[in-house]
Amino acid sequence: MNDLLLAEGIAKSFGTNRVLRGITLAVGRGEVVGLFGPNGSGKTTLANIISGLILPDRGRIRFEGKDVTRMTMDARFRAGIAQTFQIPDPYPSLTVVESVRVALLCGQPARQAGGKEKGGLEEELDSLLLRTGLFAQRFWPAAKLSQGCLRRLEFARAISCRPRLILLDEVFSALSARDEAELVALMRALHREAGISFLLISHNPLILEELCDRVVAIEDGRVFWEGRPGDLAKYVPAANHAHGHEAETGEEGQG
């Protein structure tokens, strides 16, 4: 596989709690990889290490063949690694356009590498807000947004650096059916039109089956299964249980 991202032997502890125990995970160019596991399995910690939000105790992160293990989160963002968070938007007091502008300025080198000049900042902002369906809410403070609009804001901020890889942490959780469908369509368009790779963290096997090329299942800080999305429920008991529960109730569990 032509790996865009390779995380090798990643270990992380918080005090005496060993969260990750030598995980290795790869994402190919243009690939959508699902990351499945129960609460506390280390999914979010792994994403935070890949994005540079936290550093590993041991292991190495390579992105486009370059060792980025000690790079800051801002530097990785400029290099093309973006992340959305389970609890959206770090700037609740900013308006939508202000929040996206912060991300766009942070990603300025990547934006210019894509052929944009500084004078096009406002045009780029408008384009991002139109693409993510937030133009009408551009002057709203983030604290006033619905859950669906907050997820859109996370997407707008993430794609502002023209990323090669986006880490999506439970981005489809706690959404209405309409919001989920629209965000799925946005993700697919970004994948199809821009060739963006995704690492999609979800406790919902139906979402993983629908969107992913491959799924990696982790538990207790280790990879214990990897394969085709359609085989997840056959080999992973937690996925089989979740699959049946969602089929019966139409609801997602907490994950």
Residue ranges and their predicted role:
Residues 208-210:
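A short, surface-exposed alpha-helical micro-motif characterized by mixed small hydrophobic
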Residues 202-203:
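H-loop/switch region of ABC-family ATPase nucleotide-binding domains
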Residues 51:
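Helix-to-loop junction immediately C-terminal to a conserved catalytic motif
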Residues 166-169:
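Catalytic Walker B motif of ABC-type/P-loop ATPase nucleotide-binding domains
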Residues 36-38:
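The feature captures the beta-strand-to-loop junction immediately N-terminal to the Walker
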Residues 116-137, 185:
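Conserved ABC ATPase "signature" region
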